[in-house]
């Protein structure tokens, strides 16, 4: 279903929770993602902030593809609470980032 591994989303969430100290690392990590992973990441975040429902994942994904004009790092960092939205989005999609986050610590 998702075009990005949960472990990658978990890593982004961890960086997001420490954005003041980890912005450079977050930007570097996001640069390693391919286009499909970036679109999926944005769709997950939108679901987590209630812009789309979990049932509308593919619609959110298509919207992310159409509206991708800002670099993913800039868009995420410019979105307040993006890490919380990513966690919520994964939960709504039936996946938890908690185990993946713990394995990365």
Each predicted region: which residue ranges?
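Short terminal alpha-helical segments
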Residues: 2-24
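Residue-level detector of well-ordered alpha-helical segments, enriched
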Residues: 8, 34-41, 56, 85
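Noncatalytic partner-interaction/assembly domains of nucleic-acid and motor enzyme complexes
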Residues: 21-31, 71-77
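Long, charge-enriched amphipathic alpha-helical scaffolds and associated charged IDRs
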Residues: 22-23, 32, 36-37, 52-53
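Structural motif
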Residues: 28-38, 80-81
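Short, hydrophobic/amphipathic alpha-helical patches that form generic packing surfaces
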Residues: 39-49
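Short, surface-exposed beta-strand/strand-loop-strand elements in extracellular ectodomains
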Residues: 52-63
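Helix-rich interaction surfaces within compact, conserved domain-sized segments
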Residues: 67-105
């Amino acid at each position: 279903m998702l075009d990005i591994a949960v472990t990658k989303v978990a890593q982004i969430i961890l960086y997001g929770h420490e954005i003041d100290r980890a912005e450079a690392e977050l930007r570097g990590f996001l640069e390693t993602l391919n286009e499909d992973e970036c679109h999926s990441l944005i769709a997950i975040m939108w679901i987590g902030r209630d812009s789309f429902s979990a049932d509308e994942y593919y619609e959110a994904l298509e919207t992310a593809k159409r509206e991708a004009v800002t670099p993913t790092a800039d868009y995420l960092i410019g979105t307040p609470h993006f890490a919380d939205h990513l966690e919520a989005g994964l939960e709504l999609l039936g996946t938890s980032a908690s185990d993946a986050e713990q394995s990365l610590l």
